[in-house]
């Protein structure tokens, strides 16, 4: 990577990884609730719904927080979610029916019952970013909830990678770092958002826009050249630049 490109990415990351990033980002929802377990549960369900138009999916995330009266962890753990998310064919959000969300949250409730938290599940099954992605995908596939969570790591698993960024990176005004003690942030995988891919192609960091795990890992390797200790800092640079370009 050329030095001027490396410097541009570093400068962009410093510009965009600030608290000002939060209001328009789905990461804001985990900051709106109290308690580590609640933040983790809110972050997971928010990440699952984070695709498409923010104007459309933000209200779907807020519906969950409102239904849970701000305590998403207890709402899931105690089974209270069942009265709000029935197992029906009615549309919840875009491709997801209420029944899809029902199976997702039922699987998550079972995980909490068995392991205590998703963090403890991941701790017992993974020590790197890609292992954590694989473990999360595998669990929900085995629980018949792969409509929402990818079945395996052949795809880029963008939303799972984003959730892991939120959970693992510490010292950030955006990311929580609640799992910093179980996963090394240097092993995290870049979430392949449309804006991120667009800017990576423009800067010559990628040659293909194929949303595969192989592409995500190639971009992560490029970010390791700029941020050897924290490659996903580059996510803020590319995502922020892409959003700004779109708004011009």
Each predicted region: which residue ranges?
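HhH-family (HhH-GPD) DNA N-glycosylase catalytic core used in base-excision repair
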Residues: 1-248
């Amino acid at each position: 990577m050329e030095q001027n490109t490396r410097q541009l990415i570093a400068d962009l990351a410093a510009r965009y990884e600030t608290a000002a990033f939060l209001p328009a980002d789905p990461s804001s929802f985990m900051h709106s609730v109290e308690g580590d377990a609640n933040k983790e549960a809110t972050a997971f369900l928010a990440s699952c719904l984070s695709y498409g138009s923010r104007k459309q999916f933000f209200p779907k995330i807020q519906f969950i927080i409102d239904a849970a009266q701000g305590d998403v962890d207890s709402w899931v753990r105690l089974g209270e979610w069942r009265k709000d998310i029935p197992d029906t064919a009615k549309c919840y959000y875009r491709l997801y029916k209420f029944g899809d969300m029902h199976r997702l949250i039922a699987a998550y409730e079972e995980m909490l019952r068995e392991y205590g938290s998703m963090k403890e599940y991941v701790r017992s099954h993974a020590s790197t970013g890609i292992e954590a992605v694989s473990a999360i995908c595998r669990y929900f596939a085995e629980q018949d909830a792969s409509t929402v969570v990818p079945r395996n790591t052949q795809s880029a698993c963008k939303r799972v990678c984003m959730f892991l960024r939120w959970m693992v990176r510490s010292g950030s005004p955006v990311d929580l770092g609640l799992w910093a003690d179980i996963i090394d942030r240097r092993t995290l995988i870049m979430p392949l958002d449309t804006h991120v891919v667009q800017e990576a192609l423009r800067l010559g960091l990628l040659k293909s826009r194929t949303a595969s795990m192989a592409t995500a890992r190639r971009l992560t390797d490029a970010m390791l050249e700029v941020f050897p200790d924290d490659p996903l800092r580059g996510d803020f640079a590319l995502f922020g630049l892409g959003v700004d370009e779109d708004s011009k």
